[in-house]
Amino acid sequence: MDCINTLFSVTGQDAHAVFREEQMVTVANAFKDGAASYSGDNSANVWQLVLFLRAGYYVQSNHPSDVGQYGQDLATAIEGGLDAFFANAHSKDVSAGNGDVLGEVVVLSDSANEQGRYLDVYKRVLTGYNGSYDAIPSMLAAVNDVYTPLWRGNWNDAYVKAVTADPSIIDTLDSFARDHLDLLGTDKSYLDSNAGMNVGRYVEHQPLQDKVRPLMKGLLDASKITGPTAPLWVTVASQADSYDKGNCSYYGVCNLADQLTKAALPVTHSCDQTHTIKAQALTAADLDAACASLLNQDAFFHKLVKDNGPIPGQYESTVQIVVFASRNDYQTYAGAIYGVDTNNGGITLVGDPTKPDNQPMSIEYQKDPDDGFPAGIWNLNHEYTHYLDARDDMKGDFNQQTTVPDVWWIEGLAEYVSYGYRGVTDDGAVSEAGKHTYKLSTLFQSTYANSDVTRTYPWGYLAVRYMFEKHPEDIANMLGHFRTGDYAGGYAVYNNDIGTRYDDDFDAWLTACASGACSGKKAR
């Protein structure tokens, strides 16, 4: 699987050689043959064929000039494969083996833009769900995968026409959301809230509005803005706000972001004139602990990066720290209130520092179990470092800051300060150091696009720590450029001036780090 997954990043002549239409047709025909004899698991390697086809559609969508056009020959072949798979009785098996393959095939129906053809299949998967699935993660994932074509199909005219002609899929989604309210507040809450979200998504389409509006209102009435049913309420309300805003009073969702903020973040506390916390459930003691940690971090940061204070001409003098009571609450509310992705451990928005009304903020949550951060606020000091770095080291907004490969610095510094300031050993980084996975010169090229979590965070930490301990003058040189907005000049310091010169020394340093040199002492 790992080998096939690498194909999603193929470009250029390789993309044409691997994914041109005749190649895809050959694989689609092989998938059809495998689907006809599918036994309910991956013993015949059907999964690999499906992943290859998904990769082909993905690469062609993103690099059509590399791959070339796809036409009716491929459409016919892929429909034959999908038809054969879904007609096979084993595609209905409730088992770990079938769940793995079924979910991928469902997503393939979306990749191929065949959503309208398989509405009955999607209904079958949703209505088939029952408690027997709960002990089989891959079956739960397969049910959730159905929401991908149902959601993305809304941009496909053929799909919208199919749903308009037979809107029973909307009734299936509504019934799923109503029949499984008991999932809300559990670790399977997403199955129910995603059903409600998809019901609401159809309200964009005028021919479906008379059907969808009362269903949305019914789901809102069956749930509440806070408490265990909030994930359903918020997702449906968000669809009304996005696609039927003119009728907000009918749903009771006018000024939705304000409603959600008042309901979910009732606590407002000023640490001082420039640091404000908005929280869901922090106690007075929690607020005191968080404020003390934030305010004391400034001096530690300044001593480390040796800045001259805030970058002149930027509006980043105040910061708001938003803290939800749990990861579930963060994922329920943060996207709807602030428009952020919540598939992360928190996020910092520096905004547009050229605007006088700019308000940087970090959006976080309390983690259970607590990992030792003040007030249990996960990544509190990591996210606050992002704010300080933007204010004092990196001129411009986030897009300007990332015009060059500098994720090793952005995320590595945040990790290094977070662990060093708290005097905690980064056990994950120490473990990675012993593996010697990356050269320093490779880490210097890290971007959010080419790096996974391990390369971004523990290896970013290691790169930054090494540079501070062994070559602080290079960091000073680099930051001198970053602070004026000269990101190309800063990049040249480590890409051109340093290049590969430190790779051998970094490798030796990693050995020492893994042997105890990277203990929990405070960074200097």
Locate predicted features.
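Extracytoplasmic/secreted proteins, especially bacterial periplasmic and envelope-associated proteins
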Residues: S168, A289-A292, N296, A375, ...
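Metalloprotease/metallohydrolase-associated module, dominated by Zn2+-dependent proteases
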Residues: V404-D474, R524
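Non-catalytic architectural context of zinc metalloproteases
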Residues: M1-E22, Y38-D41, D174-M361, L443-Y457, ...
